[in-house]
UniProtKB/Swiss-Prot annotation:
Protein keywords: Cytoplasm, Lyase, Metal-binding, Rhamnose metabolism, Zinc
Classification of source organism: Bacteria, Pseudomonadati, Bacteroidota, Bacteroidia, Bacteroidales
Keyword Lyase among record annotations: yes
Gene Ontology cellular component terms for the protein in this record: cytosol
The protein's name: Rhamnulose-1-phosphate aldolase
GO BP annotation list: pentose catabolic process; rhamnose catabolic process
Cofactor note: Binds 1 zinc ion per subunit.
């Protein structure tokens, strides 16, 4: 059977972005074993032939009703699949799903019946919220950046915007390319409804949120842009740690310098 990506260059390009990001996550050491997830709303790339495709799985319950996702299509990383494998074989380690009209269930339509991530309800709940606000964001990326996670083991960095201001101050690019900062979510059980609800709430003010002692969750227009936000934040964490390892507390950019950037580049914060 031919791949859903065949003769669909726009869709193939979007899935290949996911594969490229998956490779970066593995190379950086942020995706141990099957760690991390990527879910992308690909509805805009769906044609009539895809809409007529028969499911290759039974109907599966999402576990929650998501009214804004009716008729939407997503590419999802598979459960227990490794990012390093997805980077090479995206359609063997992920699948395309169709949300059914009840907005509470889905079927897999391509290429193989790869069950989506166990965190699918959380990811889809975020996408439902994004659509409810007419957000242009189509991708959600969850990964385990080492240095950012390390910072959450220190109580002071769990206070609102303490980590944001520190990370912004390390290098101008972080302020410029992650302009809404880093939200903080106190530890909650992985894959829980409570974690999903807290994530949606925190994403009202941030594009990237930190799950204490767990990882990062980011949203953006595509998987690459979501990755970029995480990448610049972790670069700042590395600069901070490098300075501490040299035996000094880094000065960082001043509040006045960061405010100057916000005005000059019309940043939201």
């Amino acid at each position: 059977m031919k791949s859903i990506l065949e003769n669909r260059p726009a869709l193939a390009k979007e899935v290949n972005k996911v594969a490229e990001v998956a490779g970066y996550l593995w190379q950086k050491g942020w995706a141990e074993r099957n760690g991390g997830n990527i879910t992308v709303n690909i509805t805009e790339f769906v044609d009539d032939e895809i809409r007529r495709m028969e499911p290759i799985s039974e109907v599966k319950s999402i576990g929650v009703t998501l009214p804004y996702l009716k008729g939407c299509y997503f590419y999802c990383k598979g459960t227990n699949k490794r990012m390093r494998d997805l980077a090479r074989w995206p359609m063997e380690n992920g699948s395309v799903i169709r949300i059914l009209d009840d907005c509470a269930s889905y079927v897999i339509i391509a290429d193989e019946a790869v069950a989506p991530t166990s965190e699918l309800p959380s990811h889809l709940s975020v996408h439902n919220d994004l659509l409810s606000k007419n957000s242009p964001y189509k991708a959600s990326v969850h990964t385990h950046p080492i240095e950012l996670i390390a910072m959450t083991h220190c109580e002071k960095f769990l206070q609102k915007d303490v980590a944001t201001n520190l990370l912004w101050s390390m290098i101008p690019e972080t302020k410029a390319f992650c302009p809404r900062g880093l939200g903080i979510i106190p530890y909650k059980l992985p894959s829980s409804v409570e974690l999903a609800e807290a994530t949606i709430k925190e994403l009202q003010d941030y594009d990237v949120v930190m799950w204490e002692k767990h990882g990062v969750f980011a949203v953006d227009c595509d998987a690459m842009q979501a990755f970029d936000q995480i990448d610049v934040l972790n670069k700042s964490a590395l600069i901070y740690i490098a300075a501490k390892n040299m035996g000094f507390e880094p000065d960082g950019m001043s509040q006045e310098q960061m405010k100057e950037m916000s005005v000059a580049f019309n940043l939201p914060k």
